[in-house]
Amino acid sequence: MAKKVILFLVEGETDEDALAVIFTRLVNNHDIKFEVLRTDITADEDMTVKYIEERIDKVIQKYLLKNPFVGDEDIIKLVQIIDTDGAFIPASLVKQSKNRKTEYFDTHIEAKNKNRLIRRNISKRNIVYSLYNRETVAGFPYEIYYFSRNMEHVLHDRAEDLTDDEKEDLAFDIADQYTDQPEKFLEYLYDDDFHVCGTYKDTWEFIMDGSHSLNRYCNVAVFFEQLEIGLEKESTK
């Protein structure tokens, strides 16, 4: 096949709607195309570090069965994007809710079921820590990036609970705004309000610290830096 493939693992339909076309446009001149696979394995309460690679491999094999003209040699990288959901905060910052709802704040979480949410956080933290320290998963080069606390929080500064319809509307807003000018989206990823500076590992150590995974942060710009697609290069075109 003419173009190499980056398999793009996202958590939901809104992520796909908002990002897939824009990312494809940004790498259009690099003989790369994105294939989007939907999976939310890091948030699966039954998932463990032991089985995470096996689960990702199943997602990839399912894709390859549906796309017989794509071979292992055509896939240059797996890229996973997750929402942090405040999962990396210390257990002491999870409080028992008094109104029987789970609510997220910049400094803590008030949980409907405190112990269950702490277990979820520990599980997700262990899985993500394992993943960002790996260079390969299922035999392919692998990278993982985050929106904190989630995509709507980063791209729209909307930290409140949103309905699925509201999330979809916001995703289409992003697609409409940046599809024809993807370099502006890349510029936005460096916004001082949420951009995390540093190396790939630096950005992960930062978000794992304290209450950062509750706050508005994003390291997706590093993905484009790894591909040598950056603001300097884009601005000289």
What residue ranges belong to the model's regions?
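C-terminal accessory helical subdomains adjacent to catalytic cores in phosphodiester-
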Residues: A2-K3, D17-D46, D57-K237
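Catalytic nucleophile-elbow at a beta strand-turn-alpha helix junction centered on a G-D-S/GDSL motif
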Residues: L7-L19
